[in-house]
Amino acid sequence: MQKNAAHTYAISSLLVLSLTGCAWIPSTPLVQGATSAQPVPGPTPVANGSIFQSAQPINYGYQPLFEDRRPRNIGDTLTIVLQENVSASKSSSVNASRDGKTNFGFDTVPRYLQGLFGNARADVEASGGNTFNGKGGANASNTFSGTLTVTVDQVLVNGNLHVVGEKQIAINQGTEFIRFSGVVNPRTISGSNTVSSTQVVDARIEYVGNGYINEAQNMGWLQRFFLNLSPM
């Protein structure tokens, strides 16, 4: 008796664990890796006894006199103005119909069918029809606005800057995360050290959160289980 109870308990535990796994939906973050970068010190030049040196160390505190200071090195900051407004709509409809009719007769009925048709002429008629109507439509709209300051984590060979950044906002018992990454052309950076997100190449914008509000939006494990099994 105890052996059967232990066996039943083990099966029930495995079933509960498998059902719990149905509740978790894995998600891959759009922005992966570190969301900040530290300035990289350049190599120390070797003094050659001349006024003009072959290499000069990077001076991160350099302030241009006749030009705006713009990010150009790893660790420099840049403000991204989020101006995303995307909308899409799609509709489709289809109609199909088909009708058919067949008519044929027998002048002479075989003897073994006379009980069914009689001795007179037998006529057979068949008709059929098929009609199909279908309609579909979809609408989507997405608006994202705000600002986020990011850091240059890579300077590409052609001079473009790969930037990445994150902003965390704690509200009551939940935390909101805004992450951004992309490639910026230095020519699109304004004098106020800002660039619109619409001018960023390969932009990745992610807005997620955690806490009880985010957990309330997740489907329960039992409901998720029946959703996976339901054919409807």
UniProtKB/Swiss-Prot annotation:
For biological process, the GO terms are:
bacterial-type flagellum-dependent cell motility
Question: According to the UniProt entry, where is the signal peptide?
Answer: 1-21
> What is an example of a GO molecular function annotated in this UniProt entry?
cytoskeletal motor activity
Q: Which Pfam families does the protein's record reference? A: FlgH
Q: What does this protein do?
A: Assembles around the rod to form the L-ring and probably protects the motor/basal body from shearing forces during rotation.
Q: Provide the assembly information.
A: The basal body constitutes a major portion of the flagellar organelle and consists of four rings (L,P,S, and M) mounted on a central rod.
Question: What protein am I looking at?
Answer: Flagellar L-ring protein
Name of the gene this protein is made from = flgH
